[in-house]
Swiss-Prot record:
This protein's UniProt keywords: Amino-acid biosynthesis, ATP-binding, Cytoplasm, Histidine biosynthesis, Hydrolase, Nucleotide-binding
The name this protein goes by in its record: Phosphoribosyl-ATP pyrophosphatase
Protein's organism: Stutzerimonas stutzeri (strain A1501)
GO BP terms: L-histidine biosynthetic process
Pfam families, alphabetized: PRA-PH
Similarity comment text for this entry: Belongs to the PRA-PH family.
Length: 110
């Protein structure tokens, strides 16, 4: 895992027990999962809008900024649910070299 993801995962874990007024992440944890999920949704929309703007303008700076926000809040969500970023990287590794059609066909039917 990248050093950045490792450091971020450590910070997110450390903030779980912190006072809500000590950091933004601690305040999100204190507000609960619904607030965290709301932020993930908000950042998803902002990322989509930034992608549309980048396609028109050719300037990807807002896209990169909003994608970083989306990834960050997704990592907060994972941490709040007791998951580590490595689990996502492991899943991506598992899929590497696997056709998207084959992966989809192998999913359990619901």
């Amino acid at each position: 895992m990248s050093d950045t993801l490792t450091r971020l995962a450590e910070v997110l874990e450390a903030r779980k027990g912190a006072a809500p007024d000590s950091s933004y992440v601690a305040s999100l944890y204190h507000k609960g999962l619904n607030k965290i999920l709301e932020k993930v949704g908000e950042e998803s929309v902002e990322t989509i809008l930034a992608a549309k703007d980048a396609a028109v303008s050719g300037d990807s700076s807002d896209l990169i900024y909003e994608t970083a926000d989306l990834w960050f809040h997704s990592l907060v969500m994972l941490a709040a649910l007791g998951q580590h970023p490595q689990a996502v990287l492991d899943e991506l590794d598992r899929r590497f070299g696997l056709s998207g059609h084959a992966e989809k066909a192998a999913r359990p039917q619901t």
